[in-house]
Curated annotation (Swiss-Prot):
Entry protein name: Extracellular metalloproteinase 3
Glycosylated position list: 173, 243, 385
Binding residues for Zn(2+): 192, 196
GO terms for biological process, alphabetical: proteolysis
Keywords on record: Glycoprotein, Hydrolase, Metal-binding, Metalloprotease, Protease, Secreted, Virulence, Zinc, Zymogen
Organism lineage: Eukaryota, Fungi, Dikarya, Ascomycota, Pezizomycotina
Organism: Trichophyton soudanense
Protein family (similarity comment): Belongs to the peptidase M36 family.
Length: 391
């Protein structure tokens, strides 16, 4: 019998899941959005209830000084767990709407925790939770998520120690527009950063968070972040001809912060596997990898249909739509690849993931998608002279 009654209703006024940024909709009040992945709700860790933006999965606060302490930093307080605060696109400075920003960051982080849990990023896999119950892994490692962090601008980052130590996200303000913009309000940036935690915990196992620190593997770390951010923002009206940017709202630039848009069109985005030969920066390499995964997602949507429900529908552990299936296969691949993998090894890990999950039902679809940008059967890794293959 539990000492704490975990089941307390909560409400968050935020940009809902699937809305990437303020250009896509308006804040709405969302009640009790957690899933079974958060049995204590988002505002309890099973031992204590918190009338603020703290719980089992995350602790969200502002951090204007950019310092490393967080526990005594400012958070909105709401004894009735109604986190409803004003925001307007003309409000300035961002600190004037810090309650809204912290709530939004808390919501997006928790919502992504719950989605990834459904795909298998759970306690035993090394996820970010204080209280793991008796479900394996190491606890005491929620995500420390800082809104309006003063240690930088026009960027964001996520630090991932091994399982059992908290991850730390720093979200910055962007000085690219007047008034300045708060990166917390662009869900894709939050998702990109949290995905560093996912990939670093899965690749090489949760006890080793140093398996994505080579140039090519570090590039894929950036690419996975862009891929999940983009897959989550897809809309029902989208088709394989829909192009997406990364970071466009925060950067105040329709092209976003990458060299090319994410597009299945090789004229719009000409990146190929051999493009990596001339790239020396992880975000550039990541854009190549995410472009391949964007192609893969649309190939699986064409094969299985696309659903735009917030949560996947599973049958025998398999997401029943191509969008969520791509997210599941890509995530499973992270855990199957070697430490510091290259593109060829990561591709093979996704094929292995499909074999384990569906008995290779999508083998041809996956090969064809990767071959499109030169990561086909004959592709070979060499740090200075990669060989492409369209077959």
């Amino acid at each position: 019998h539990n000492v704490v009654d975990y089941v307390a209703s909560a409400e968050y006024k935020v940009f809902a899941w699937g809305l990437n940024d303020p250009t896509e909709g308006n804040p709405t009040s969302i009640r009790d959005p957690w899933t079974d992945a958060s049995p204590y709700t988002w505002n309890s860790d099973g031992m204590s209830k918190y009338p603020t933006t703290r719980g089992n999965n995350a602790i969200a606060q502002d951090n204007p000084t950019g310092g490393s302490t967080y526990i005594n930093n400012y958070r909105p307080q709401s004894p009735n767990l109604i986190f409803s605060y004003p925001w307007s696109p003309t409000a300035t400075p961002p600190s004037s709407y810090k309650d809204f920003s912290i709530t939004q960051l808390f919501y997006t982080t928790n919502r992504y925790h719950d989605l990834l849990y459904s795909f298998g990023f759970n306690e035993a896999a090394g996820n970010f939770q204080v209280n793991n119950g008796n479900k394996g892994g190491k606890g005491n490692d929620f995500a420390i998520v800082n809104a309006q962090d003063g240690s930088g601008t026009n960027n964001a980052n996520f630090a991932t120690p091994p399982d059992g130590s908290p991850g730390r996200m720093r979200m910055y303000n962007w000085t690219t527009a007047r008034p300045n913009r708060d990166g917390c309000l662009e869900a894709g940036i939050v998702i990109h950063e949290y995905t560093h935690g996912l990939s670093n915990r899965l690749c090489g196992g949760p006890a080793n968070s140093a398996c994505l620190n080579a140039l090519e593997s570090g590039g894929m770390g950036e690419g996975w972040g862009d891929f999940y951010a983009t897959a989550i923002r897809l809309k029902p009206r989208d088709t394989k001809n829909t192009n997406y940017s990364m970071g466009a709202w925060a950067a105040n630039n329709p092209k976003g912060i990458r060299a090319y848009l994410y597009s299945t069109n090789l004229q719009t985005n000409p990146y190929m596997y051999t493009s990596v030969n001339s790239l020396r920066e992880v975000h550039q390499i990541g854009t190549v990898w995410a472009s391949m995964l964007y192609d893969l997602m649309w190939a699986l949507i064409e094969a299985h249909g696309g659903t735009y429900s917030a949560n996947p529908v599973f049958r025998n552990g398999v997401p029943q739509d191509g969008r969520h299936l791509s997210m599941k296969l890509v995530m499973d691949g992270m855990a199957l690849q070697p430490c510091n993998p290259n593109f060829v090894q990561a591709r093979d890990a996704i094929l292995d993931a499909d074999r384990a999950l569906t008995n290779s039902a999508n083998k041809c679809t996956i090969w064809k998608a990767f071959a499109k940008r030169g990561l086909g059967y004959g592709a070979k890794y060499d740090a200075r002279n990669r060989t492409g293959s369209n077959k």
